C-alpha cells in the first residue's frame, strides 16, 4: 500500500508563512516527519505539494486509479474547488482531510469544506501531527 499525501497551495511555504497559525515546521521538515513515520509503520508514502489545482487534480486521479488511500491538505482549494471535490469522489481506498490550523476557529469562509462529506475522516487544528495520525489510521484500518 502506498499512501498518497497531497498538499495544496501555499503549503510549500510552511515555516515562512504565518507561523502563529501554521507553526514553525518547514515543508521540508514536514516531509521528513511523514517519511520517518511511514518507515516506522512499514508503509510506502508519496508526499507531494503543488500550488496548481490542475496538478493536484491529476494526483488525485492517479490515486483513484491506483486505489491508493489519500491524506489531503488542499489548503484554500478545500473551500473553493468543486473540481477537486469531484475528483475526490472517485477515491475508493479512503480520504483523510487534514488541516494544520483549526479552520473552524478562523475566518467564516474557511468553515465550509467541499471535501469533508466525502472524507473517511477530518483532522483539523492538531498541527503537523494531523498527518501522522492520518497515516496511523490508514495502517491500522488496513490491518484490521
Curated annotation (Swiss-Prot):
Active site: 22, 99
Chain segments annotated as transmembrane: none
This enzyme's EC code(s): 4.2.1.10
Signal peptide: none
Site residues (Transition state stabilizer), renumbered to this chain: 17
Catalytic activity: 3-dehydroquinate = 3-dehydroshikimate + H2O
InterPro entries referenced in this protein's UniProt entry, alphabetically: DHquinase_II, DHquinase_II_CS, DHquinase_II_sf
Keyword vocabulary terms for this entry: Amino-acid biosynthesis, Aromatic amino acid biosynthesis, Lyase
One annotated GO biological process: chorismate biosynthetic process
Coiled coil: none
Molecular functions (GO terms): 3-dehydroquinate dehydratase activity
Pathways per UniProt: Metabolic intermediate biosynthesis; chorismate biosynthesis; chorismate from D-erythrose 4-phosphate and phosphoenolpyruvate: step 3/7
Binding site for substrate: 73, 79, 86, 100-101, 110
Alphabetized Gene3D superfamilies for the sequence: Dehydroquinase, class II
Pfam families associated with the record: DHquinase_II
Top-rank EC class of the record's enzyme: lyase
Domain of life: Bacteria
NCBIfam families (alphabetical): aroQ, PRK05395.1-2, PRK05395.1-3, PRK05395.1-4
Function of the molecule: Catalyzes a trans-dehydration via an enolate intermediate.
Subunit comment: Homododecamer.
Family: Belongs to the type-II 3-dehydroquinase family.
Official protein name in the record: 3-dehydroquinate dehydratase
Recorded name of the encoding gene: aroQ
Amino acid at each position: 500500500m502506498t499512501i498518497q499525501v497531497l498538499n495544496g497551495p501555499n503549503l510549500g511555504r510552511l515555516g515562512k508563512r504565518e507561523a502563529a497559525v501554521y507553526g514553525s515546521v518547514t515543508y521540508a521538515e514536514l516531509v521528513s516527519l511523514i517519511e520517518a513515520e511511514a518507515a516506522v509503520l512499514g508503509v510506502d508514502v508519496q508526499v507531494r505539494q503543488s500550488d496548481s489545482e490542475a496538478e493536484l487534480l491529476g494526483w488525485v486521479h492517479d490515486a483513484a486509479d491506483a486505489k491508493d488511500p489519500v491524506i489531503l491538505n488542499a489548503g484554500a482549494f478545500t473551500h473553493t474547488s468543486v473540481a477537486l471535490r469531484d475528483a475526490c469522489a472517485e477515491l475508493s481506498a479512503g480520504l483523510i482531510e487534514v488541516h494544520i490550523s483549526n479552520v473552524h476557529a478562523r475566518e467564516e469562509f474557511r468553515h465550509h469544506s467541499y471535501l469533508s462529506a466525502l472524507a473517511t475522516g477530518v483532522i483539523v487544528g492538531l498541527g503537523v501531527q494531523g498527518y501522522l495520525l492520518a497515516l496511523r489510521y490508514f495502517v491500522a484500518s488496513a490491518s484490521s
